[in-house]
Regions:
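Zn2+-dependent metallopeptidase catalytic domains
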Residues: 1-186
């Protein structure tokens, strides 16, 4: 079974690297995207008035599988990549970029976030909750939630291209660092 589909049953939730194989990553990303989409759909379709709990916290907790697999995968590709991991990262980059755009450019979801944000001064939030609300709201705004439809379509194109270029650049830097040799003559 795929170790990413459940929480790691180790002390402190440390990943079980001995159980993680290359073939586990892609299905975990795809299932994580599906899980987050379902959770976001539940947030959007909620008939309840948007609150910090049913919108901001729900969004923050919407992707346990995706968070788990992303944390490990991207650390592995940054620190100890292989040709197979590199190929997979290039394959997944546009998929993940599209998924992120589908969230950050979702007008119904942003409206709920904005509704909570506009009443932030009257919510009696803790400092941590205020930080999460500010971070969530600003992330959506900075990711294009306030752009018109035409601008959002262009942003999606740019993000898709950037995702692949960013991975390629990172891999080139890593390959050059790994190939570096220092010769010292006596």
């Amino acid at each position: 079974s795929n170790p990413f589909f459940t929480e790691f049953q180790t002390e402190y939730g440390v990943p079980s690297f001995d159980k993680i194989k290359l073939e586990h990553y892609e299905p975990a990303f795809l299932k994580g995207i599906e899980e987050q989409n379902q959770n976001i759909e539940a947030i959007i379709e909620s008939p309840e008035v948007p609150t910090f709990e049913n919108t901001i916290v729900a969004l923050d907790n919407s992707a346990p599988i995706l968070d788990r697999v992303s944390a490990i995968f991207f650390n592995m590709t940054d620190a100890e990549t292989t040709d197979s991991l590199t190929e997979l990262s290039i394959k997944l980059a546009p998929v993940l970029s599209e998924h992120e755009d589908n969230i950050s450019l979702n007008q119904t979801l942003f409206k709920r976030i904005n509704d909570v944000y506009q009443q932030k001064d009257s919510l009696n939030l803790t400092i941590e909750q205020q930080r999460l609300l500010d971070k969530t709201y600003k992330s959506f705004v900075r990711s294009g939630a306030n752009l018109d439809t035409k601008q959002q379509a262009r942003l999606r194109e740019i993000n898709k291209e950037l995702s692949t270029l960013g991975i390629t650049f990172s891999n080139n830097v890593l390959n050059e660092n790994n190939a570096f040799q220092l010769f010292v003559d006596k």
